[in-house]
Amino acid sequence: MTVPEAQVDAFGQDHVPPVVGTFEDAATGKTIHFWTKPIAQLLEVSVATYAQERIATNPTLNNLKGIDVVLGGDHGQGKFRSVIKIILRDDAGLSVDTLVMKVGHIDCTKDTYEVLKSSVAGPLNDSLKEVIESGALQVIRDPNGSVFFRMKNDEQDDQQLTIISSLHIRVFVTGNLTYSAAILGNVNIAGGWCTWCGLSPREWSPTEHDKGQLWTLEAMAEVRTSIRVGITADTSANRQGCVDVPLQTCVPINSYSLPILH
């Protein structure tokens, strides 16, 4: 059961409020409601709260060296939900503990490409970009001895603050094949084209087939641009599964955990 945001807000402590929005679904004419949460701010607040609650009883938290942020999404019971799993890792790269936080929600009957594009995809992409550009969550002590967490920002230079440690952040994306295909622009899985390398079903079906050239976000964008400006004809063979532009533009494809197609 999900606690209503209004009730969570009422507690008033260490809560990151959602950013709400609406849009009119062109396919149904209905008003779709959605919300997202800024992931960078959520990391600062949630990890700090977790550390304060657990570090006294779990001494391994003192050895934290890195954080993995895994974004995922799924649809069910008339709603789309996007969550992040925060994996806390020690200096050996082993998982110390995990947190799961909801970062996006859409009231919709289907999580189509257009629905995602018109709602949570943009804000979550910008939010992930902020985390990636920062690259680390810093543990900081102020002159009064209080400890807090802050995303690394090279433009911030407060000499009164002491950086205790800097937790390197890696970002990944996961989800079922439908969700992964949608956010990569491979709408409706594009007739079975490989998400990894762009081979057609005829090419990847043989057991001992040759490996194709691995996709990059830049290569996908080039395919769409070439078709849009008329350099390349808009055919299935030329699209190679790239039906539309990717909705996630800051996480490289080799950081996706995709279902195995071949």
What are these regions (language model features)?
Residues 2, 22, 26-41, 63, ...:
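Intrinsic disorder
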Residues 129-262:
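Charged (Asp/Glu and Lys/Arg) segments that form or flank catalytic channels of large polymer-
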Residues 5-83, 155:
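Structured nucleic-acid-interacting core domains from mobile-element enzymes and related host factors
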Residues 116-136:
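Inter-domain linker/hinge segments that demarcate the starts of reverse transcriptase
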